[in-house]
């Protein structure tokens, strides 16, 4: 196991499914229709569903295609957060959270790239996928539970509008013509288990 593997595995989410659901509901309550936070919540749900699609694939071609869709939405979302939301966190006197968020997302993207080098139907692939998913779920929990809710409360309406415009601009710039493809990743129903979306089964 590489150093990055160990880092990702070490942050497998300690929080429960109930805690993650509560964090998401808290963030939904703070969000406004069409704003940057509601867009991020939608993208988080799409990422969770994309992980589940990768895990559920039954042949190499299906898994490779699902992996590409996961990488697409995860990278587009990460780029938009890193360009717009994390700098806003830093400006709101949350430099520690901003730095931690950058570090976690960089590790997840690096690991997802390495995952693509493994045989897609192997147990090594599934183990690494689960480590990455666990790290991403924990990262999402941090953002939804406090970081982004606090940011939403600290900023004025003009700043909120600018964040919304810039976040979607960066996301759509990366996704390009693939935005409809990503939209085809159906978010999990509200109330569905977040933590067990892609957990491995005995083989």
Segments from the language model and where they lie:
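Small-residue-biased structural context
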Residues: 1-203
């Amino acid at each position: 196991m590489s150093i990055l593997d160990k880092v990702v595995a070490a942050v497998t989410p300690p929080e429960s499914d109930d805690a993650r659901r509560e964090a998401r509901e808290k963030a939904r309550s703070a969000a406004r229709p069409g704003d940057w936070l509601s867009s991020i919540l939608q993208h988080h749900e799409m990422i969770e569903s994309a992980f589940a699609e990768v895990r559920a694939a039954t042949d190499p071609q299906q898994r490779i295609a699902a992996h590409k869709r996961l990488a697409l939405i995860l990278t587009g979302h990460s780029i938009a957060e890193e360009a717009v939301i994390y700098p806003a966190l830093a400006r709101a006197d949350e430099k520690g959270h901003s730095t931690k968020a950058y570090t976690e997302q960089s590790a997840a993207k690096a690991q997802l790239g390495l995952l693509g080098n493994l045989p897609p139907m192997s147990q090594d692939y599934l183990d690494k996928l689960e480590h990455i998913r666990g790290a991403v779920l924990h990262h999402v929990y941090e953002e939804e539970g406090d970081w982004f809710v606090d940011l939403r409360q600290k900023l004025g309406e003009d700043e909120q509008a600018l964040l919304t415009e810039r976040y979607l601009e960066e996301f759509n710039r990366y996704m390009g013509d693939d935005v409809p493809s990503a939209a085809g990743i159906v978010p999990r129903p509200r109330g569905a288990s977040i933590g067990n979306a892609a957990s491995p089964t005995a083989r």
